[in-house]
Design a protein with these regions (language model features):
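Metal-dependent phosphoesterase core characteristic of DEDDh/y 3'-5' exonuclease domains
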Residues: 1-91, 95-99, 103-112
Length: 113
């Protein structure tokens, strides 16, 4: 499982919601720092879990730009999600997934196998 900031945002929300609904996860995930056994959090890895000098973390779009990864929605961010129509929301989410995947493919072999 690979994502951007998934250890601090996406997965805790999904797990708490699953717990509230009585849905047991189909597999257990490794939330330990510095581990890439079951979960690869690209933000944590690229910024050494907040231990790098300089800015503690940067957003996916900023990092994608540094790696010359195309962003089809440069003027939108997560704060705009509530006002997006369904078609734009789907395209926005697909764009984030594509950027994350491309970033993962470019960094593979440097931080994990």
């Amino acid at each position: 499982l690979c994502g951007w900031n998934i250890l601090n945002f996406d997965l805790p929300i999904i797990l708490r919601r699953s717990w509230a609904l009585g849905i047991t996860p189909t597999r257990l995930l490794d939330f330990r720092r510095y581990s890439t056994t079951t979960t690869i959090d690209l933000m944590q890895i690229l910024y050494n879990w907040g231990n790098s000098p300089g800015p503690r973390y940067r957003g996916l779009k900023e990092v994608a730009k540094m790696y010359n990864i195309q962003n089809d929605f440069p003027n939108l961010d997560g704060s705009d999600v509530a006002t997006m129509d369904e078609e734009t929301l789907i395209a926005y989410c697909r764009n984030d997934v594509r950027m994350t995947r491309e970033l993962a493919m470019r960094t593979r072999g440097y931080y994990w196998k």
